Every structure is written in C-alpha cells, then in structure tokens.
Amino acid sequence: MKFNVEIHKRVLKDLKDLPPSNLKKFKELIETLKTNPIPKEKFDIKRLKGSDEVYRVRIGKFRVQYVVLWDDRIIIIRKISRREGAYKNP
C-alpha cells in the first residue's frame, strides 16, 4: 500500500537548520513512510495522545510530527522542531 507524503511549507523552511546527519535521517524517514506509515522497527515513533492520526518521530534532538490520513493514503509532515518546542502550537 503506497502513501503520498506531503511536506508542509513551514517544514521545508525549517529543514535548512537541520544538521546534515539529521537531514539524511529525515530523507530516509520520508522514503520509508511512502510504504510504511508507522515504521516502529526502524524509527522511534509514538502516537500523540488525543489523536489516532498524529505521530511523532525522534531524529536526534529534533521531533517530526506527521498526520496519517488512512482513507486517502496521505501522510502530511506538519512540523519539525527541537525537542524543547516540539509539542507547543506554532
């Protein structure tokens, strides 16, 4: 089952601040999400409380939040930030 991965424009802007090793891991995450929306065996992924569709991935000191729209087979990467600010609203 193939998923379409969409990256929010704010995330694209924030990627410029990512260290090269974390950027490489982020790209690996995107490729993996296309075929496996919750790759727990490969990444540190947890579902966020209060939602069945929102997940977070730990990449070093950064957190990536994404939404899985199961019926539409779409994954939206909606936020990437340091751990300190990851769970606050934008």
UniProtKB/Swiss-Prot annotation:
Gene3D superfamilies according to UniProt: RelE-like
Species of the source: Methanocaldococcus jannaschii (strain ATCC 43067 / DSM 2661 / JAL-1 / JCM 10045 / NBRC 100440)
Role this protein plays: Toxic component of a type II toxin-antitoxin (TA) system. Its cognate antitoxin is RelB1 (Potential).
Gene name linked to the record: relE1
Top-level taxon of the source organism: Archaea
Keywords: Toxin-antitoxin system
Family: Belongs to the RelE toxin family.
Protein name listed in UniProt: Putative toxin RelE1
